[in-house]
């Protein structure tokens, strides 16, 4: 398979693309892959470090308010479509995939106009602007949440799940909690994590909760995010930590540690939920209030409604409420087991293979 793939801006668009690439390479080692992104986006660093060839185009997203910048955006879009057609002619892909972010708009649109099989993947419960626009031109649209179905032409929608799930589904306990973080193997661990950059609201509540956590029969691994770590460690609550609480700035290769944790407190981003459900981990979700269309709340509700997660709105989050919810899961092993089972049933552990099947179908239609 010759695959041209594009997605950028945030890790939520990039990591599913890389997971799909990995699955294709496992299935067809001779496959040729080309990733198209922007030189400013996260993809310019993440994609080459994953060993995937990258070409960049110049493009920018629309401003949501009326702005003269939008005229520049239209100009750059038209120019980048022209540039993408040249990239496509040179690479000669069998299929073109977009995983979201404005960069994939020009790439997938150009491919569709050139009559090349095209597919877009929507990770969230509320469709992004770019994927909504592209859905009129592509052959198929992959979704991860039933709520997203209504945003696309019904005949094009396929429920595939998130390829990232397949990447983590087979991961095993490697004892990192004990070896690297000096936590006990005989006590269950809850990980509190606000995303790669951390989250001030979650951090503030977790910090204030430390005196209560000190009295519990479970352990807490509190990951602050690098930018917040020094500030957190300067607080009184972070001094003389109890034996059952560890504070870390970040965790390298986070998914690899997930099989060792009994439960997670964190955001409700699409990639996180794909990983959590693939492994069947009960969670307390605190949706980010700063995302478009409040899509993280809708993501979270898909698991809350299946009794696979609890949810706290950030505006309601306090140390007491955090501890009360963590206790509900960590002090009740039967509940934890059932929530984990429900989470696993909500996941699609072979999501990358599901996407590959759709790609093969549209290539051979």
Curated annotation (Swiss-Prot):
Known EC number: 2.4.1.227
Membrane protein topology class: Peripheral membrane protein
Pathway(s) annotated for this protein in UniProt: Cell wall biogenesis; peptidoglycan biosynthesis
Annotated CDD domains: GT28_MurG (cd03785)
Binding site for UDP-N-acetyl-alpha-D-glucosamine: 10-12, 124, 196, 251, 296
Main location: membrane
Subcellular location: Cell membrane
Catalytic activity: Mur2Ac(oyl-L-Ala-gamma-D-Glu-L-Lys-D-Ala-D-Ala)-di-trans,octa-cis-undecaprenyl diphosphate + UDP-N-acetyl-alpha-D-glucosamine = beta-D-GlcNAc-(1->4)-Mur2Ac(oyl-L-Ala-gamma-D-Glu-L-Lys-D-Ala-D-Ala)-di-trans,octa-cis-undecaprenyl diphosphate + UDP + H(+)
GO cellular component: plasma membrane
Alphabetical keyword list: Cell cycle, Cell division, Cell membrane, Cell shape, Cell wall biogenesis/degradation, Glycosyltransferase, Membrane, Peptidoglycan synthesis, Transferase
Function: Cell wall formation. Catalyzes the transfer of a GlcNAc subunit on undecaprenyl-pyrophosphoryl-MurNAc-pentapeptide (lipid intermediate I) to form undecaprenyl-pyrophosphoryl-MurNAc-(pentapeptide)GlcNAc (lipid intermediate II).
Similarity comment: Belongs to the glycosyltransferase 28 family. MurG subfamily.
Name under which the protein is recorded: UDP-N-acetylglucosamine--N-acetylmuramyl-(pentapeptide) pyrophosphoryl-undecaprenol N-acetylglucosamine transferase
Phylogenetic classification of the source organism: Bacteria, Bacillati, Bacillota, Bacilli, Lactobacillales
Name of the encoding gene: murG
């Amino acid at each position: 398979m010759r695959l041209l793939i594009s997605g950028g801006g945030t890790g939520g668009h990039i990591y599913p693309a890389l997971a799909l690439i990995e699955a294709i390479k496992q299935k067809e080692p001779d496959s040729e892959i080309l990733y198209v992104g922007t030189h400013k986006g996260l993809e310019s660093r993440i994609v080459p470090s994953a060993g995937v060839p990258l070409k960049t185009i110049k493009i920018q997203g629309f401003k949501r308010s009326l702005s003269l910048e939008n005229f520049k955006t239209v100009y750059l879009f038209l120019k980048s479509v022209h540039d993408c057609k040249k990239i496509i002619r040179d690479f000669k892909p069998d299929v073109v995939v977009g995983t979201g972010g404005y960069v994939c708009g020009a790439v997938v649109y150009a491919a569709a106009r050139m009559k090349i099989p095209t597919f877009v993947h929507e990770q969230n419960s509320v469709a992004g602007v770019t994927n909504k626009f592209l859905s009129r031109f592509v052959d198929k649209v992959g979704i991860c949440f039933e709520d997203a179905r209504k945003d696309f032409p019904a005949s094009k929608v396929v429920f595939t799940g998130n390829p990232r799930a397949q990447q983590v589904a087979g991961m095993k306990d490697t004892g990192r909690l004990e070896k690297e973080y000096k936590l006990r193997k005989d006590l269950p661990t809850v990980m509190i994590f606000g995303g790669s950059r951390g989250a001030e609201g979650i951090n503030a509540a977790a910090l204030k909760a430390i005196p209560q956590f000190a009295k519990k029969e479970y352990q807490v691994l509190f990951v602050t995010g690098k930018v917040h770590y020094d500030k957190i460690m300067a607080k009184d609550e972070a001094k003389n930590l109890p034996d059952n609480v560890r504070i870390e700035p970040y965790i390298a290769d986070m998914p690899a540690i997930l099989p060792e944790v009994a439960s997670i407190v964190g955001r409700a981003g699409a990639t996180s939920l794909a990983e959590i459900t693939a492994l069947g981990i009960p969670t307390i979700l605190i949706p980010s209030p700063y995302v478009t269309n409040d899509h993280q709340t809708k993501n979270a509700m898909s698991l809350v409604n299946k009794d696979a997660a609890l949810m706290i709105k950030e505006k309601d989050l306090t140390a007491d409420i955090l501890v009360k919810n963590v206790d509900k899961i960590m002090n009740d092993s039967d509940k934890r087991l059932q929530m984990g089972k429900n989470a696993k049933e909500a996941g699609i552990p072979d999501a990358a293979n599901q996407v590959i099947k759709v790609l093969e179908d549209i290539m051979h239609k």
